[in-house]
A protein has these predicted regions:
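Short, solvent-exposed amphipathic alpha-helices that sit
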Residues: 7-11, 38-61, 75, 79, ...
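Structured segments of extracytoplasmic/periplasmic soluble domains
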Residues: 14-22, 50-57, 82-86, 108-112, ...
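Hinge/cleft segment of the Venus flytrap/periplasmic-binding protein
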Residues: 145-191
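Short beta-strand segments enriched in small/hydrophobic residues
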Residues: 25-38
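Loop/turn elements at helix/coil->beta-strand transitions in domains of secreted/extracellular proteins
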Residues: 22-26, 54-63, 89-93, 115-119, ...
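Hydrophobic alpha-helical segments within soluble ligand-binding/sensing domains
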Residues: 1-27, 74-77, 125-129, 144-162
Length: 191
C-alpha cells in the first residue's frame, strides 16, 4: 500500500521549494472522489505537519484540500476549468492527488494561459504528464514504484496459494519525477 508518511514527506519536499520567501503561499490539494482515500487524508495531514515545522520566519502556508465529486463524466474537467476561469481562486501551488486531476490541470494551464502562474505537483506519470514536466509546465510528479507493486503482488499471491491467506502489509515506495529524470519513466522507444 501507499506509505502515507513517505509520500507526505516527498510532497512536502517539493512544496517547500515553492514557498514564497515572505508572506503567505496558498497550497491546494486536489483529488477526486474516486482517488480520495484514508491514505490521501494521511498524506495531507503529514504535509500540513511538516510544512508547519519547516516554514521560516515570515512565511505562512494556507493549505486547503478539495475533493471533486467525480461520479459523472467530465466532473473533474469542469471543476478544473471553473477554477481557472475564476482565477481569483487559483492557489500558488496546486498538488494533484491522481493522474486524471494532473492531466486536467495541465490542459487548463495551457488553455487559460496560466503557465507559470500556478506551480503544479502532479501524481503518477503518463506520456502527457512526462511531456508537461519536460516543458516545465508541471514542476514534478510523485509516482508509486510500479515494479515494487508488481513484486509485492506476486509475493502476496504466492503466500495466499501456499498458506491459504495473505496477511502482510506491503509498503510501496514512491519516486519524485522531475525534468532531470523523466527519461527513466519513458518506454525504450520514447527515449
Amino acid at each position: 500500500g501507499l506509505n502515507s508518511y513517505q509520500t507526505g514527506s516527498a510532497y512536502t519536499e517539493q512544496i517547500s521549494g515553492m514557498l514564497k520567501a515572505q508572506g503567505t503561499t496558498s497550497v491546494m490539494f486536489l483529488s477526486t472522489s474516486s482517488s480520495k482515500t484514508q491514505e490521501t487524508n494521511l498524506v495531507y495531514s503529514q504535509v500540513k505537519k511538516e510544512l508547519e515545522a519547516q516554514k521560516k520566519t515570515g512565511q505562512s502556508v494556507d493549505l486547503t484540500e478539495y475533493c471533486v465529486d467525480s461520479s459523472a463524466d467530465f466532473d473533474t474537467e469542469e471543476f478544473v476549468r471553473d477554477m481557472f476561469v475564476n482565477d481569483e481562486n487559483l492557489p500558488d501551488v496546486l498538488v494533484c492527488m491522481d493522474e486524471v486531476v494532473t492531466e486536467c490541470v495541465y490542459q487548463a494551464l495551457i488553455d487559460y494561459n496560466q503557465v507559470g502562474n500556478v506551480k503544479v505537483i502532479g501524481f503518477y506519470y503518463s506520456d502527457v504528464i512526462l511531456d508537461a514536466i519536460d516543458k516545465e509546465i508541471i514542476s514534478s510528479a510523485i509516482a508509486l514504484d510500479m515494479d515494487e507493486i508488481g513484486r509485492y503482488s506476486v509475493n502476496a499471491l504466492d503466500e495466499y496459494l501456499s498458506l491459504g491467506h495473505s496477511n502482510n502489509y506491503y509498503s510501496v515506495n514512491q519516486h519524485v519525477i522531475t525534468k532531470e529524470n523523466t527519461k527513466d519513466y519513458r518506454t525504450e522507444d520514447e527515449k
